[in-house]
């Protein structure tokens, strides 16, 4: 993963309304193994983060100037340090307007994966820990907590530059339960949601369930294809990449690689050729689980409609083919 440019600035601010103080770095960070490891860990943590949203830039304006600065940098009008400085000054201003915001180290990293350029921006905080010295003494130790990302975004610069119709070249971490504490960061990037990741994933899973039903597949085959879909989606999510419907279709049925893709198009589910995988929705699709009043139920989703029947009006489940271990326990209950 070649790192083209990387820099860190510090915004010192507490959530008490006091002015934010910017400590800007004057030059890029030199290439080092530490920088490479930090960015690799950051990407791994970011890709694993649930609840991300995907979108695109607002039209450039005084309220949303970031895309204009990025364009100027990519076209050679600004060097990376100058670009990051004007951007972090804008972030400082937005932080001061948001009483809930706290400061931190602001990372800007321009890197490549394959032939694709990315820009990652993250607000990082320290954690207190301990370390053991060469003299075997235990000493306090501070480190960047890359595992707890709350404000971060990643821009697929190549997609932004080359595909004017794309609505998902930016991904960003959304605040939990609509918390406004993260809104200033989204405004800083100047992005708007363009793709409903959970909604698109639910539609894809509905299309897949319809496909399996229309094909009248045996249970083993349905289970295998379900695993293929979930494994592919999870793999793409781990890489931070969207799911390609044509590629997924080829994996689901190698003998008829276009079958699932044609099903999606013919039934007009309204899915984009590439959609972001929402991990929370995928996990719900893999299994149904529930617990209440001493009862715990968990079963694989593909069993619904075959071994397990759900009566919504009566609020009941009918389970066929109980596990032998369970029936043996029931027989011995007296």
Swiss-Prot record:
- Entry-linked HAMAP family: NdpA
Entry's family note: Belongs to the YejK family.
Q: Where in the cell is it found?
A: Cytoplasm, Nucleoid
Q: Which GO terms describe its cellular component?
A: bacterial nucleoid; cytoplasm
Is Cytoplasm one of the keywords?
yes
| Taxonomic superkingdom | Bacteria
Keywords from the UniProt entry: Cytoplasm
Q: What is this protein called?
A: Nucleoid-associated protein Pfl01_0983
A GO term for molecular function: double-stranded DNA binding
